[in-house]
Structures are given as C-alpha cells and as structure tokens.
Amino acid sequence: MDSKVIRETLRKCQLFAGLSDEELKPIVELARVEEYKAGDIIYEQGHFGTKLYCLSKGQVSLLRRIGLSDGTTATSTVYILRETRLRRIMGCWCTLLGEDHIQMCSAKCDKPSKVVSMACSDLKKAFDKNPGIQTKILEKFILILRDRLESSYAALETL
C-alpha cells in the first residue's frame, strides 16, 4: 500500500516527475511514508539534515528564524507546501552529494500531514548505481534552483 502512495507522491514531485517507472523504482523502494499531526515539526532550522521530503497530504509551512538588530528573533514563513499538482521538495539537498547540510529553515505541519521521506545517503547510493538517474536529477535540481533564485530576486525587488 505504501509503495502506491510513495509512487503517486513522487510522480507529483518536481524533482522526480520526469523519471520513467523503471528509473523511479529504486527510489520508491527506499522511500518511507511519515505521518505528522498539526503543529509537529518535521525538521528544525540549525539541525543537521539527513532526508529529503515530498508532501503527500496536508500542509507544511517552511519557517525561518531571523535574528533582529535588537538581539531578539522573529519567525517568518518562507513558503507553504500544499497539495498542488506539482510539489516542491524540502529538506537537505546537499547531502545528495555527500556534503553535510544544516537545515536553513524549519518545516512545521499546519494540519495533519503525510510526507514521503528519503534518506539522502540511500538516495546517493541509488544514484551512484544509476548514473543516468543521477544526471536527470541533478539537471532537474539546476532548473529548480534557477526558479527559486528568480523568485528570490523578484521578492527582493519588492522591498
């Protein structure tokens, strides 16, 4: 049952949407479904990241703590992940390359949610065995990062 949910979720994920069934198979096999209640934290800013996540059901806010000039902190919503046609990936991208990664924001469930999680170390091993998949994923990452940079620049221009 979980493999069906995982496959359907990964098909909706920006990062994996273009993979064939055969290419997606090793990723489905290592992925897991995690369930959270409203208010649960999936991962926290400043902590070491080890997984990538894709929202299956529910809603998750990405929150960033920001240090203010008076020494206090504020929390800002960076992005809200919803059950859309094309889903964003969240978590620790750099560990796919074997690099340590500290989470740059926190992921908090706004309502009961299910996510598909993948340990980055397992993903890296799967990619190392299948260089063609790795190439497709890294090409997709470049396009996703380009879009996010464009979005960030557009947001800065409104300040």
Role assignments for model-derived ranges:
Residues 2-8, 26:
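Cytoplasmic (intracellular) domains, linkers, and terminal tails of multi-pass ion channels
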Residues 116:
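Conserved active-site beta-strand element of glycosyltransferases/polysaccharide synthases
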Residues 11-65:
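Regulatory nucleotide-sensing modules
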Residues 95, 102-104, 120-159:
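A small-molecule sensor/coupling module
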Residues 41-110:
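Cyclic nucleotide-binding regulatory domains
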